[in-house]
Amino acid sequence: MPKHGKKYRSAAALVDRNKLYDPMEALELVKKTATANFDETIEVAYRLGVDVRHADQQIRGAVVLPGGTGKEVKVLVFAKGEKAKEAEAAGADYVGAEDLVAKIQEGWLDFDVAVATPDMMSLVGRLGRILGPRGLMPNPKTGTVTFDVANAIQEIKAGKVEYRTDKAGIVAAPIGKASFDVERLAANFRALTEALLRAKPAAAKGQYMKSVTISATMGPGIKVNPARLTATAEK
């Protein structure tokens, strides 16, 4: 039984596995490899020269992609009083406090991002074991613990994505959909790369961006030349 289907093999045949592609060339190619019968997500994986065993070399943050993500995002906000009203006015999908905590404890998780005002974190902390492993716990580093709930909601709805290093020092994040034109994907790719360059830990030694791979949901990986990518982002 073949490991991959015919569509994947046809897409993989377009990619030179030994080549480091120019960023724009890689984006044009990844669109050609997206052959599934749905609008595939385009994702980038950066292998960074960081030692995540040290807390000061763990990278976590968020960036607003100028071209958006192409995804409808459901935002939940933990807030009370005036801040709850602000959240509702800004377009939050769910707003509440103890009621939402109880609902989540019962197994409800129909949202993509959670935001909380700082005064709500003692309450939200009860959900650590549920939200933490799913990457849904509000965090000041990603701008999801804030009193400026309206701005947080607007940024998330506009295309804010979170990123963090995993145990292997890899950051993987989406930069849009296969239906996006190359220029829109390029703007998002650049924004994400710039954010990671700004987040470089002072203690990181040697080459920072060791490898960069771009792929569609069901497609093969395409290696991007890190030096060309860094030079493009720093212009």
From Swiss-Prot:
The UniProt record lists the keyword Ribonucleoprotein: yes
Alphabetical list of Gene3D superfamilies matching this protein: 3.30.190.20, 3.40.50.790
GO cellular component: large ribosomal subunit
This protein's UniProt keywords: Repressor, Ribonucleoprotein, Ribosomal protein, RNA-binding, rRNA-binding, Translation regulation, tRNA-binding
GO terms of molecular function: rRNA binding; structural constituent of ribosome; tRNA binding
Listed InterPro entries: Ribosom_uL1_bac-type, Ribosomal_uL1, Ribosomal_uL1-like, Ribosomal_uL1/biogenesis, Ribosomal_uL1_3-a/b-sand, Ribosomal_uL1_CS
Domain of life: Bacteria
Keyword Ribonucleoprotein: yes
Listed GO biological process terms: regulation of translation; translation
NCBIfam families, A to Z: rplA_bact
Function: Binds directly to 23S rRNA. The L1 stalk is quite mobile in the ribosome, and is involved in E site tRNA release. Protein L1 is also a translational repressor protein, it controls the translation of the L11 operon by binding to its mRNA.
Family the entry assigns: Belongs to the universal ribosomal protein uL1 family.
Subunit structure and binding partners: Part of the 50S ribosomal subunit.
Protein name (Swiss-Prot/TrEMBL): Large ribosomal subunit protein uL1
UniProt lineage: Bacteria, Bacillati, Bacillota, Clostridia, Eubacteriales
